């Protein structure tokens, strides 16, 4: 299967997971087995702290920069980096700088 995120209209989600600002989400796959999406956080926006229950999450940074709050540790994120949040763990992401932070998210269900 080939995914073209440019062919998917974004959904604007205010205060994503309780974060600041908004997220622009393009979900290409949501088939009951997991989800594959891109998420664009404009400058000043964030993904609020949340715990993964029933799935894990793999996030690859496509562009921009930010900081990941990973189980209480702050880890800088830049393009080309990948973050993994196992099931039962907590994370959140803030943008840093003036450019949007663009992420590829993969969330396989743990069922």
Task: List where the protein language model places each region.
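Conserved short histidine dyad/triad with adjacent acidic residue
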Residues: 37-52
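Glycine- and acidic-residue-biased ligand/ion/polar-headgroup-sensing regions
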Residues: 54-66
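Short beta-strand segments in beta-sandwich/barrel cores
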Residues: 46-47, 64-69
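Short acidic-glycine-tyrosine-enriched beta hairpin
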Residues: 73-87
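A short, N-terminal "cap"/entry segment at the start of jelly-roll beta-barrel domains
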Residues: 1-35, 48
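Ligand-binding loop in jelly-roll beta-barrel domains
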Residues: 55, 87-111
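Short, surface-exposed secondary-structure edge patches
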Residues: 38, 58, 73-75
């Amino acid at each position: 299967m080939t995914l073209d995120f440019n062919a998917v209209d974004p959904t604007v989600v205010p205060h994503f997971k309780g974060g600041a600002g908004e997220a622009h989400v393009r979900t290409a796959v949501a088939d009951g087995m997991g989800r594959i999406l891109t998420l664009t956080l404009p400058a000043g926006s964030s993904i609020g702290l949340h715990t993964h229950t029933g799935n894990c999450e793999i996030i690859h940074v496509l562009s921009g920069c930010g900081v990941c709050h990973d189980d209480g540790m702050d880890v800088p994120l830049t393009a080309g980096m990948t973050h993994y949040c196992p099931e039962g763990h907590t994370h959140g992401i803030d943008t840093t700088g003036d450019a949007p932070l663009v992420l590829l998210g993969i969330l396989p269900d743990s069922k």
